[in-house]
Amino acid sequence: MSELSVNHLLGIKYLNKQDIQLIFETADHFKEVINRPIKKVPSLRDITIANLFFENSTRTKLSFELAEKRLSADVLNFSSSQSSVKKGETLIDTVNNILSMKVDMVVMRHPNPGAGVFLSKHVKASIINAGDGAHEHPTQALLDSYSIREKLGDVSGKKVVIVGDILHSRVALSNIFALGLQGAQVMVCGPKTLLPKYIDKLGVKVETNLLKALNWCDVANMLRVQNERMDISYFPSTREYTQQFGVNKELLDSLNKEIIIMHPGPINRGVEITSDVADSKQSIILDQVQNGVAIRMAVIYLLASKIKQ
């Protein structure tokens, strides 16, 4: 059987094109499984996985937990708000205490960029990065590309624009890496204040006019404004942001072609996207949610296969 070139999923930048292809092919199989009447397989009955979330999460945490249980893994859920971390315990001490319970794999979300990489150098378990600060969110990028592949047949050659708060988004960076590996053309669009200074060095096009960006693309991935990561004001008002960078039905109908709309969630309806767009036939937002379980099953299964060797 083919295997991943890595022992951890720390970021898309550590993967190659073959890794992504293998994850997608494995996800194809698991997507068929989760659409059966009996949605569970016994693949990981001997594997224990700890979900460590040091930042709040609903969708990603539930998706990982469901993926793990669909694979029959034993699951341990950890919340930093109810732990010794609040008492000053270090990350390594926390994880080593959990690993002493014979945990094989750790899924971790952490506010500090590089936390997963740091942890992988100090513990023996396989690490999956479920988001590290504003750095990377690899499984989100994988499920986004997988959803594009499912809808358009292939990612290569497709034009994808990522719209919104690029500066604070781990989803944007992981998507740029993943789409680039697969041969897509990538553009970022948003207010200048929310575009990283050297973003063009990553090989992406940069646009501040939303209409031009949407007329260029095949797919628009809409990002929310991450107010919780902002300590200053990056634009005059939410109303002005919506006027310049919000997508509504009238704007979509004015384009020179029909495009696909995506969103990693959570959606701020009426800000970056209106309800009639989010719920339209051009939207594949719910497909992304469903595909997230299959992709995470694939990643967990492939990494667990390396543990068992």
What function would you assign to each model-found segment?
Residues 38-146, 269:
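Phosphate/diphosphate ligand-binding glycine-rich loop within oxidoreductases
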Residues 44-49, 156-160, 258:
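Phosphate-coordination loops involved in phosphoryl transfer and adenosine-cofactor binding
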Residues 125, 183-185, 254-260:
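A short helix->loop->beta-strand "cap" motif at the edges of active sites that frequently abuts
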